[in-house]
């Protein structure tokens, strides 16, 4: 049986308004604040800021 672990699945959603998103995991103990990272948005065809949203 697997242990519970300290990583949560999160959704990184584009701030360009295209609706594109990435899914990833983050360690909730070492990084309790919301994550914001610059990634490539293929719909906007440029690098934009992605912000953490709740994964439904």
Curated annotation (Swiss-Prot):
Gene Ontology terms, MF aspect: structural constituent of ribosome
GO cellular component: cytosolic large ribosomal subunit
GO biological-process terms attached to the record: translation
Biased composition (Polar residues): 15-25
The UniProt record lists the keyword Ribonucleoprotein: yes
Stretches for region Disordered: 1-29
Keyword tags: Ribonucleoprotein, Ribosomal protein
Biased composition (Basic and acidic residues): 1-12
SUPFAM superfamilies linked: Zn-binding ribosomal proteins (SSF57829)
Family as reported in the entry's similarity comment: Belongs to the bacterial ribosomal protein bL33 family.
Matches recorded under PANTHER family: 54S RIBOSOMAL PROTEIN L39, MITOCHONDRIAL, LARGE RIBOSOMAL SUBUNIT PROTEIN BL33M
Descriptive protein name: Large ribosomal subunit protein bL33
Source organism of this protein record: Verminephrobacter eiseniae (strain EF01-2)
Gene of this entry: rpmG
